[in-house]
Amino acid sequence: MTDLHIVEASIAELRRALEAGTVTSVELVGACLRRIAHYDRHGIALNAVPLLNPKMFEEAGASDWRRRNGAALGPLDGIPYTAKDSYKVSGMTVAAGSPAFEHLIANEDAFTIGRLRAGGAVLI
């Protein structure tokens, strides 16, 4: 991977790096997970990302395949993002931090999540 600092990089910078082939979406997802692990799971243990998308690497790999084949879905294709756990993501819990809702599973995506997914963005 390049010397790109993903935490400080803008979406435009990440997109340019993806388009240039200096980084892949899979690598960006891995870098995000390392950053999350550093602050969320160890050290000061923020627990800011309580739920991870189990399909993130599959989605990132699909984005990389589309990019290699000239079929990117748009400027957000391959860009990792997070969403508050109160947003509905099909197949994932919508607990909003409440133990009372920890088993509530979304059966559809919220509008914003659906738009991001349609554009190829990768939910962490």
Where are these regions (language model features)?
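Loop/turn elements at helix/coil->beta-strand transitions in domains of secreted/extracellular proteins
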Residues: 24-26, 45, 72, 79, ...
